[in-house]
């Protein structure tokens, strides 16, 4: 006959042993999780007209005919708006083309006319502009660390140099409406790839406003630029001009 006291003692020993084994198997610190680290504060990196350069990549007559994510007139207007704002803010501009003698065609003439003295790098075959030594030298010669990039096509001629510049610690701002490609699917994929790598996606209008900072710096000048490329903006400037004229004191009669 079994001794009841021995049975109870054995049960207690087994329970104690199991408890020790379970405790030993737990990761250290499980009972008290470490305090969560505070999230890193977001830093708003603004465009600075004193530290920015504009790279216009492969806006060539042949390549532009491939752009389908914007209408031809809409796209051309955005490209020229970016060019005009670069001139307005006196930003260094670098023009580059790829394989001009092939189907890509020459640089669109309006850009060459706007920037006759800008560095013009006709790449003999480099698909990625950053693979061209002369192009990179021209970028570095500006002394600017913020690069405003636009081009055709978005997933190649914009994305490749944008990613390369990010790798070399430049701040990259991609002008989405002055960059074009075959369709919205490739557009979105290219934007996602660049944004996830650290590029900021902006419109030409956003670029202009961020560079300008304050309307009081020059109302008429920036307003004229906007009116040239945004038809409805002319209504705002017409209204503003009328108010300004009405507020002027009448000339004194002699």
Where do the PLM segments sit?
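N-terminal secretory signal peptides that target proteins for export/translocation
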Residues: 1-7
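Active-site acidic carboxylates
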Residues: 29-120, 124-125, 188-195, 200, ...
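Short, acidic/turn-prone active-site loops that include or flank metal/cofactor-
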Residues: 124-127, 177-180, 207
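A contiguous pocket-lining binding segment that forms or flanks enzyme active sites
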Residues: 146-204
């Amino acid at each position: 006959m079994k001794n009841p006291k021995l049975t109870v003692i054995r049960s207690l020993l087994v329970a104690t042993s199991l408890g020790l084994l379970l405790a030993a198997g737990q990761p250290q610190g499980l009972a008290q999780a470490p305090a969560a680290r505070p999230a890193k504060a977001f830093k708003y990196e603004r465009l600075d007209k004193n530290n920015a350069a504009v790279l216009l990549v492969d806006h060539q007559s042949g390549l532009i005919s491939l752009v389908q994510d914007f209408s031809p007139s809409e796209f051309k207007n955005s490209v020229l708006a970016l060019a005009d704002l670069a001139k307005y803010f006196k930003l260094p501009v670098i023009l580059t083309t790829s394989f001009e003698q092939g189907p890509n065609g020459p640089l669109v003439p309006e850009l060459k006319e706007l920037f006759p003295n800008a560095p013009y790098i006709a790449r003999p075959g480099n698909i990625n502009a950053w693979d061209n030594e002369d192009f990179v030298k021209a970028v570095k010669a500006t002394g600017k660390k913020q690069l405003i990039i636009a081009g055709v096509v978005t997933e190649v001629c914009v994305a490749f140099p944008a990613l390369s510049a990010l790798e070399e610690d430049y701040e990259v701002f991609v002008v989405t409406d002055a960059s074009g490609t075959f369709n919205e699917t490739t557009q979105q994929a290219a934007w996602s790839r660049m944004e996830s790598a650290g590029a900021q996606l902006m419109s030409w209008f956003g670029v202009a406003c961020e560079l300008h900072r304050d309307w009081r710096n020059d109302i008429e000048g920036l307003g004229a630029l906007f009116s040239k490329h945004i038809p409805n903006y002319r209504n705002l400037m017409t209204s503003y001009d009328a108010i300004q004229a009405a507020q002027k004191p009448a000339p004194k009669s002699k």
